[in-house]
Amino acid sequence: MPVPCKRGCGNNAVLKRPKTGDAICKECFFWAFETEIHYTITKGKLFNKGDSVAVAASGGKDSTVLAHTLKTLNERYNYGLNLMLLSIDEGITGYRDDSLETVKQNRDDYEMPLKILSYKDLYGWTMDEIVAQIGRKNNCTFCGVFRRQALDRGAAMLNVKCIATGHNADDIAETVLMNVLRGDIARLKRCTAITTGSEGTIPRVKPLKYTYEKEIVMYAHYKKLVYFSTECVFAPNAYRGHARALLKDMEKIRPSCIMDIIYSGETMSIKEEVSLPTQRLCIRCNFVSSQEVCKACVLLEGLNKGLPKLGIGKSSKVKKLLDEYNTRQNNLETAVKDLEDCNITDKKTSKTCKNISNGFKQKECNATNCCTNKTERNVEKNNEKLQTVLDKYSLENNSQVKLDEEDSDDSEIKHQDEDDTCSSSCGRLGVGF
Amino acid sequence: MAETLTVEVMFGGGAELLFNKVKRKEIALPPLKTFLPDSQNQNWTLKELLIWLKDNLLVEREELFLKDDSVRPGILVLINEEDWELHGQLNYELKENDKIMFISTLHGG
Ligand SMILES: [Zn+2]
Ligand SMILES: [Zn+2]
C-alpha cells in the first residue's frame, strides 16, 4: 500500500527518515539530504570560496557519497571549491588494492584529480609487511597512526586548505560512546568538533557529521553510486565493535539517539582540572604531535629496528624492550651508528622522505633532494636526539599509561583526533562484519 | 495449492559476502505450510522469508545477518525499492515477483 510523501508533493514515499521519522519520496529525499549537508557546511563555515579541498577517499560508501555530494553542492551553490581526491594505499592485498579501483572510478565519474600515497613510499613498509612482523593484534594501531600522518602529507603535497572526511553521524555517535566507555575525556572533548586540527596542521572537516548512515547508503543506492564494501582483512577491534552493535540496537528502537548522543558530546562540559595534552611538533618529522617524538616515528623506529612492539605496549614494556635492544647492541654508540647507517641507506635507496631519516619540514620535502641534502645536517643531530629519544620512551610515556593499555588496541590511534582511525575502514567491522 | 511463490532477493553493501557473493537470485518458495507447518501466518511474510534465507542461502555465521527474529540492526531492507519501514517490516506479506533487497550499512566506508 503506497504511503504518500510527507512533503505533500504528490509522490509516493520510498523511505522513512531516521532523523525525523518522516515518510518521504525519492526526489524530496535527495533534496533534503543534499540541503542538510549544505546547511552543515555553511553553518559550520567549513569552506571559503576558492579553497582547494581534498576529499579523503577510501572507495567506501561514505567517501563516495561525500565526493558526489560536494561536487553537486559546489556546482549548485557556487562554493568555488577546487575539489580533489586523496587516497592512502596501506598496502593490504585484497582490500585496498580493490578499493583503489573504486576510487579511480570516483575520479572519472566526478572529474576530480586523484592523488594516491602509499605507506610503502612514505614509510618503507606496506601493511602486509607490517602484519608479517607484528602479527594481527595491533595492526590497527600502525594503520591508524600512519594513515593520519599520510593524509596530512598528501594534503600538504596537494597544497589544499582542508581535508574533508566521510565521518557520518553514526560514526561520531559511536566515537562519543567509545570515549565515554574508556573515560577518555580529552578525546571526548574533541571528537564532536566539525573541524579539527591545531595550528600548523591542515584542518579536517566532516560535512556528513549530521548525516545518518542509513541515509548515506540509501542515497548511494538510489543514485546508483558505485562504492566498495568489504571488510578489512585484518583483525578488527572488538571493543569498538560492541559499541557499534549497542548503538545500532538502540538506533533501531529510537533512531534519534544518534543525534542525541552527538548533542550530548557537543554540550558536555569538561572540568577544568582535566589536563588535556598539548600539541607540539615531532622533533623528527615535524608533524604535529603531543610527544617530543610522534607516534608514527616511534612505531616506524620499532619496525626498522626489529622491535615492532615499540610504542604499542605499556611504557614499562617499551623500556624493557629498549633495554634488551641496547644490550644486544652492546652500547649506545652502536645504536647511534645503526641509526646513521639507516640514514645513509635511505639516502641512496629512496627518493621519498621517510620518517626515520627526517628532521626536516614536510614543506621542504618535495624535490629530489628531499632526503639527501636535508638529511646531512640532521645526521649529527640524531646522535643527541637518539639519546633523548631513548630516555624519552621510558620517562615521558608515564603520562600515557592509561592510553597504552594493551587491551585497548586502537587507543593510541586517536591520540590527536578521531579522524583517521580504522573506524573509517576496518574498525567498524568489529562484530565479524 | 502446491503453487510456489516466486520472489527475487538481492544483496548489497557487503551483505552479499554473507551469501556466497550472490548479488541477486530468483527464488521459488514452496507453500508456507510445507516449509513451516507450525507457522501462524497463512501466507509468506518477510519473517518467514528470513528463516528460508537462513536455511537455504546464508553461508556465513547467522548472527552476521540475523538478530532475534529480524535482520541484524544496520542491515537495510528494501521491498520493491522502498524502505521496509514503510511496509510493516517483518509483517509484510510477500507477493509474486516482489523484489526484496538487503543492504548492509556495516561495511567499511
Ligand atoms: Zn516528495
Ligand atoms: Zn614524527
Swiss-Prot record, chain B:
HAMAP family in the record, alphabetically? Answer: Urm1
Q: Which UniProt keywords apply?
A: Cytoplasm, Isopeptide bond, tRNA processing, Ubl conjugation pathway
Q: What is the lineage of its organism?
A: Eukaryota, Metazoa, Ecdysozoa, Arthropoda, Hexapoda
Its BP terms in the Gene Ontology are: protein urmylation; tRNA thio-modification; tRNA wobble uridine modification
The UniProt record lists the Glycyl lysine isopeptide (Gly-Lys) (interchain with K-? in acceptor proteins) crosslink at 109
Recorded protein name is: Ubiquitin-related modifier 1 homolog
Assigned protein family: Belongs to the URM1 family.
Q: What's any one GO cellular component for it?
A: cytosol
Where are its TM segments located? none
Q: Which organism is it from?
A: Bombyx mori (Silk moth)
What does its PTM field state? C-terminal thiocarboxylation occurs in 2 steps, it is first acyl-adenylated (-COAMP) via the hesA/moeB/thiF part of the MOCS3 homolog, then thiocarboxylated (-COSH) via the rhodanese domain of the MOCS3 homolog.
Q: What is its main location?
A: cytoplasm
| InterPro entries, per the entry | Beta-grasp_dom_sf, Mopterin_synth/thiamin_S_b, Urm1
